[in-house]
């Protein structure tokens, strides 16, 4: 395909028009975003003069041996009870023992009593 002055390539015109639209959108939206950030910033510096880590009050006592919560008294019940572990169910065989399957014979395989004589097959 040859490119002449009468018909510019369609891909380049689409690319240029999309660039112009993005530039116009940035000119409009960027100042609005900056103004919104100026009015309601996402970060508020602390009001005190101390650094933020000095304002932190630890929730536990500073005793390294036993760090109990400050709000817990010695006579109060425990705050968290861990769940009691229950063993998973195990297989329990039935108490009634069945004879093994090779001892259960169908009626036509049962042996005839010794007093009864069976016909001979030659």
Curated annotation (Swiss-Prot):
Q: Which residues does UniProt assign to the signal peptide?
A: 1-36
Where expressed (tissues)?
Root nodules. In early nodules, expressed only in the interior of the developing nodule with no expression in other nodule tissues, including meristem. In slightly older nodules, expressed in almost all cells of the central zone. In more mature nodules, expression is restricted to the invasion zone.
In residue numbers, the region (Disordered) covers 90-122
Q: Where are the transmembrane segments?
A: none
User: What keywords are assigned to this protein?
Assistant: Nodulation, Repeat, Signal
Which positions does the entry assign to sequence repeats? 45-49, 51-55, 58-62, 68-72, 77-81, 82-86, 88-92, 99-103, 106-110, 113-117
Tell me the GO BP annotations in alphabetical order: nodulation
Induction field: Expressed from day 6 after rhizobium infection. Persists up to 43 days after infection.
What name does this protein carry? Early nodulin-10
């Amino acid at each position: 395909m040859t490119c002449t002055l009468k018909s510019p390539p369609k891909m380049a015109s689409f690319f240029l028009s999309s660039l112009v639209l993005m530039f116009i959108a940035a000119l409009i939206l960027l100042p609005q975003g900056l103004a919104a950030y100026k009015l309601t910033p996402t970060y508020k510096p602390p009001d005190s003069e101390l650094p933020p880590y000095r304002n932190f009050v630890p929730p536990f006592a500073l005793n390294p041996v036993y760090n109990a919560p400050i709000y817990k008294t010695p006579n109060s019940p425990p705050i968290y009870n861990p769940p009691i572990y229950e063993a998973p169910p195990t297989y329990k065989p039935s108490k009634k023992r069945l004879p093994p399957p090779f001892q259960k014979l169908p009626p036509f395989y049962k042996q005839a009593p010794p007093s009864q004589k069976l016909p001979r097959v030659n």
